[in-house]
UniProtKB/Swiss-Prot annotation:
Major subcellular location class: membrane
Membrane spanning stretches: 140-160, 197-217, 228-248, 258-278
Phylogenetic lineage: Eukaryota, Metazoa, Ecdysozoa, Nematoda, Chromadorea
Domain (CBS) ranges: 333-396, 413-473
Subcellular location per the Swiss-Prot or TrEMBL entry: Cell membrane
Record topology, Cytoplasmic segments: 161-196, 249-257
Protein name: Metal transporter cnnm-5
Effect of deleting the gene: No visible phenotype. Quintuple knockout with cnnm-1, cnnm-2, cnnm-3 and cnnm-4 results in a reduced lifespan and 100% sterility.
Gene Ontology CC, one term: plasma membrane
Length: 722
């Protein structure tokens, strides 16, 4: 479109008919009113006719400077105006490329290269705002279609890739009905091509997002704040309707069913994008090697296992199981310097056996004399019964003799040979070997160029501890465990000291037989849950007495436990002589049972018995004082009226009611030095028994503690009576 402007240029210097020279400046003298300001669209070509006198043939331009003299500045935009026709009184100028309006440049002024003065009457061109385009129905439908396709590609990417192949296989196995299995198979068909699936949906979504953005920008052309809206509107629509909503829907419980139901749409998309997506997926597969969604780092596996575990123990087992196949024997073994071993020449005496029991090891390596690196055998603690059958431990055989005795046994269940494994062997392979039952113990050998040596040992427990954690046989959280530990330590200490201290007049085996016989004969003590160690406190050293020949022992309100000597017993039925002798040597259980039967059935009473208990009626008084319904069954033979020492000496324990009461209440406890201290009470057990439905026992009452010794007691053991 041509715009005609009427303007008059008058030369400041020069004659009216002469053309402008280089030294003759141009000055604007006036323009027609109402046409001094015009508007043009950005980059819109236009032309106009300029009237005047002595008009120049070139040198016209438009500039954004407020003065023509400043048009040479770098920050100023200048556009040259071309002279199409030039005459003496007018000229036709054109701007074929239009004026480049932008945010910072919205006004251009017409200037001439020889002009030095600018006035407001000079030609001014303003930017013209384009009219907003009318929305067409086809453009709106096309935008809706683009958003729908982009949303489908974005959501279905998550819908198909949400489950791994492991999850889909599990779902296929547990699915109920053919319809559910059919949906899983449809998902698995595309899930196996996960790389191509990701590339296809990404390409499809990107294409339709670009088409939507371009169409939306055309629809917003010419509106107010056009530049801002062209960026904000497409971005918000794509974010909300093409990303957030479809991904949220496909991530929910509906995503799986949608992906399985719209499988035919996915097939069409695969076919359309196949020429580009398939080669691109091959390139990605070439570099990634494996499924882009199936590869899990060790950290991801650890986090997954932690989320699956319900407690710390399960988490430890799962974490150890994932790394177990990478473990070597050398990482799980016990170094040879920390191993408890026996020398082949070492004797199996009392101290050694008690040390083995105290250590608690089930398998003891045996080395060759002083060289701990040469393992010649293994002593299994469970074979000690077989060892006692073959050898006599009282003779203190050496470890070599014990192993030789085990070797002579024909029973092949005795395994004393040692297996050797390489330090670089995989731990799971060794575990598979040990699970066969051939061996549960092995020596770890490290091989060098010219030599080899034993550097440690490994057991099946060491390997299992790596899987399930440390096997702690002592649970410190349970009170019962601490009680058992104290009891075990007390028994071991008792075994070490018995027979080696002057205050222990009997060997350990004889003491144990006395206590066992006491608990076997006195049933009321069992009702109080009195065990061996508590019975040992009752039969303490300060209660041992010695009677001389022809002495009549006091029987009134006393319980006598005679363990050595010969006595003459008189009861309501008969008078007989009884020999008491606790065997010092090991005897079989058959001999013990025969002696017990002879004690109760032999009328001649000539067979020695290990223990003779006199004064059982005192036990019934004890139970009555404690308020217990339990009592000792008594017969006429239990009421002894007279007891005379026949042998030169007779050793016995003398117990009064107060002694029994104090021991049961825990008021007195005798240590190894004979000192009395506070012990543990057993009345809680009695109270729990008395609260049963069959019990008619009144409320338990605890008598006051009474000193177990009095001034008129007989002379203690090893002292002569007056």
């Amino acid at each position: 479109m041509s715009l005609f402007l009427f303007a008059i240029f008058q030369l400041a210097l020069g004659s009216p008919g002469a053309p402008n020279g280089p030294n003759v400046p141009l000055q604007l003298t006036g323009v027609r009113r109402g046409l001094d300001h015009v508007q043009k669209l950005p980059s819109e070509a236009f032309s106009f006719k300029l009237f005047g006198k002595n008009l120049a043939e070139d040198g016209y331009y438009f500039t954004t400077a407020t003065r023509c003299e400043d048009s040479h500045l770098s920050t100023v935009s200048t556009v040259r105006a071309t002279v199409k026709e030039s005459y003496c009184s007018y000229a036709i100028l054109s701007v074929p490329e239009g004026l480049p309006f932008n945010v910072s440049t919205s006004v251009y002024h017409l200037c001439h290269k020889n002009a030095t003065i600018y006035t407001q009457k000079f030609l001014v061109v303003h930017e013209k705002k384009a009219a907003a385009a009318k929305y067409m129905g086809d453009e709106i439908v096309f935008c809706f279609f683009c958003i729908l396709m982009s949303a489908y590609a974005s959501g279905m990417t998550l819908g198909y890739m949400k489950f791994s192949m492991i999850d889909l296989n599990t779902m296929l196995k547990i699915a109920e009905g053919d319809a559910a299995k059919k949906r899983v198979r449809r998902i698995m068909h595309f899930r196996r091509r996960s790389t191509q699936l990701v590339v296809t949906f990404s390409l499809f979504s990107s294409v339709f997002t670009v088409l939507f953005t371009t169409t939306c920008e055309k629809m917003l052309h010419g509106v107010s704040n056009e530049d801002v809206l062209k960026m904000a509107v497409p971005a918000l629509i794509c974010l909300i309707f093409a990303e957030m909503i479809p991904q949220a829907v496909c991530n929910s419980k509906f995503g799986f069913n949608l992906a399985a139901s719209l499988w035919f749409v996915t097939v069409i998309i695969f076919f359309v994008t196949l020429p580009i997506a398939y080669p691109a997926s091959l390139v990605l597969g070439r570099f990634l090697k494996r499924d882009v969604r199936e590869v899990m780092t060790p950290e991801e596996k650890t986090c997954l296992l932690r989320s699956m575990a319900q407690n710390e123990r399960e988490k430890t087992i799962l974490e150890n199981a994932t790394t177990f196949t990478l473990k070597k024997v050398g990482q799980l073994m016990v170094p040879i310097e920390e191993v408890f071993m026996l020398s082949r020449s070492q004797k199996l005496n009392r101290s050694t056996v008690l040390t083995l029991v105290e250590k608690g090891y089930t398998r003891i390596p045996v080395y060759d004399n002083k060289n701990r690196s040469v393992i010649v055998g293994m002593l299994n603690m469970k074979n000690f019964n077989l060892l006692m059958v073959k050898t006599n431990l009282i003779d203190e055989p050496t470890v070599k003799e014990a192993l030789h005795a085990l070797e002579l046994l024909k029973d092949r269940t005795v395994k004393f040979a040692v297996k050797y494994v390489n330090i670089e062997m995989n731990a799971h392979l060794l575990l598979n070997r040990m699970k066969t039952g051939d061996f549960h113990f092995a020596c770890v050998v490290e091989y060098s160029a010219y030599d080899s040596k034993v550097v440690g040992i490994i057991t099946i427990e060491d390997i299992l501890e790596k899987l399930i954690g440390k096997i702690d046989e002592i649970n410190e959280l349970r009170v019962r465990s601490s009680i058992d530990d104290r009891g075990d330590n007390a028994v071991i200490g008792w075994c070490r000291e018995a027979g080696s201290d002057k205050k222990y007049p009997l060997p350990f085996s004889q003491q144990l037989r006395i206590l066992q016989h006491l608990l076997s004969e006195c049933q009321v003590l069992k009702s109080l849950d009195i065990g061996i160690m508590k019975a040992k406190q009752i039969l303490s050293l300060d209660r041992i007495r010695v009677g001389k020949k022809n002495d009549k022992l006091e029987l009134h309100d006393l319980l006598l436990v005679i363990f050595e000597g010969t006595v003459l017993v008189t009861n309501e039925v008969e008078t007989f002589e009884r020999v008491i002798d606790v065997p010092s040597q090991r005897s079989s259980s058959t001999v013990n049972s025969q002696q017990h039967r002879q004690q109760t059935t032999d009328n001649s009473r000539s067979t020695p018995v290990p223990v003779l208990i006199i004064g059982k009626p005192l036990l019934n008084r004890l139970m009555k004082s404690l308020g217990s319904p339990f009592s000792e069954p008594l017969g006429p033979k239990d009421n002894v009226s007279e007891l005379v020492v026949v042998s030169e000496e007779a050793s016995y324990f003398k117990l009064r009611l107060e002694d029994l009461m104090n021991s049961i209440n825990g008021c007195r406890k005798v240590d190894r030095n004979g000192h009395t201290t506070t012990g543990e009470s057993l009345l809680q057990t009695l109270n729990s028994r008395a609260s049963t439905s069959t019990s008619t026992t009144p409320a338990c009452r605890t008598p006051l503690s009474v000193d177990a010794r009095s001034q008129d007691e007989t002379t203690p053991f090893m002292e002569k009576q007056e």
